[in-house]
Each structure stands twice: as C-alpha cells, then as structure tokens.
Amino acid sequence: MVHFTAEEKSTILSLWGKVNVEEAGGEALGRLLVVYPWTQRFFDSFGNLSSASAIMGNPKVKAHGKKVLTSFGEAVKNLDNLKPAFAKLSELHCDKLHVDPENFKLLGNVMVIILATHFGKEFTPDVQAAWQKLVSGVATALAHKYH
C-alpha cells in the first residue's frame, strides 16, 4: 500500500485541480500509443493508428484518454485506498482485456511527462516525486488482480 504524506496529498490535489483532463488525457494516451507502438493492439477498434499525427488527432484516442485520466481523478479522491478504488478496473483489464500490467507503468510515466510539459516550472521536483508515487501506486493497484 502506498502511503502519502499530508504534503504529498496537498501537492497532488493542488495540481489536479488545474489539469485539463480532456487535453492531458488524450495527449497521454496518444503518446503511449506512439512511443510504445505495441500497446496499439489493445485499441484495434480505434481506426487509423498508422502514424503519430493520425494517433494524436484520432477522436477515439482523445475520448478514451479523457476516460483514462478521469479515472485518475478517482485515485486523487482515494489516495489512502488505491487498491479498492481500482479493483473493478483491475479485474476488467486482467480478465476481459488481458492488458499486460507493465503497460500501466508506461502510461503512468507518460502522464508524468505530460504534466511536466503542461505545468513547466510549476512541476517542481517535489511535485514530480508526489505524482510519480501516485502513478506508481495506481499501476500497482491496477495490476492487483494479476497477482
């Protein structure tokens, strides 16, 4: 279980309140699909994923990215209970979608990069550390059903 200090919680909540979920979510999922092309196999129904520009402009990628980042809102609301908060998503990704749990870590790392690009100097090393801890905790919670 991940333990967040009061300062880390405050840092996460403060930044989360400024995140444009639609924009950042689409960009994060899009980058995941571009940088790690083998992850595209889980998105066969999304249509054209033939190039970086096709992926980044794909409305299905943007919509699902928003959905993914919205689920991170659940993490922000449940910092002390990540595993229960992601139990159903863990089951879905394990039993029905058969997603390699390593992909959760990759997406988390991409999300940290997106946040850094969106927030620039505001994304200090302390902010990065708190968010890295969060995305790692979410990846672990999502992988829970696999164990």
From Swiss-Prot:
Red blood cells. One of its GO terms (cellular component) is blood microparticle. GO terms for biological process: hydrogen peroxide catabolic process. InterPro entries: Globin (IPR000971), Globin-like_sf (IPR009050), Globin/Proto (IPR012292), Hemoglobin_b (IPR002337), Hemoglobin_oxygen_transport (IPR050056). It holds the Pfam family Globin. One of its GO terms (molecular function) is hemoglobin alpha binding. Heme b binds at H64, H93. The keyword Phosphoprotein applies. Residues 3-147 form the Globin domain. Keywords: Heme, Iron, Metal-binding, Oxygen transport, Phosphoprotein, Transport. The modification Phosphoserine is found at S14, S51. Gene3D superfamilies: Globins (1.10.490.10). It comes from the Eukaryota. Heterotetramer of two alpha chains and two epsilon chains in early embryonic hemoglobin Gower-2; two zeta chains and two epsilon chains in early embryonic hemoglobin Gower-1. The epsilon chain is a beta-type chain of early mammalian embryonic hemoglobin. PANTHER family: HEMOGLOBIN FAMILY MEMBER (PTHR11442), HEMOGLOBIN SUBUNIT EPSILON (PTHR11442:SF7). Belongs to the globin family. This is Hemoglobin subunit epsilon. It comes from Microcebus murinus (Gray mouse lemur). The gene is HBE1.
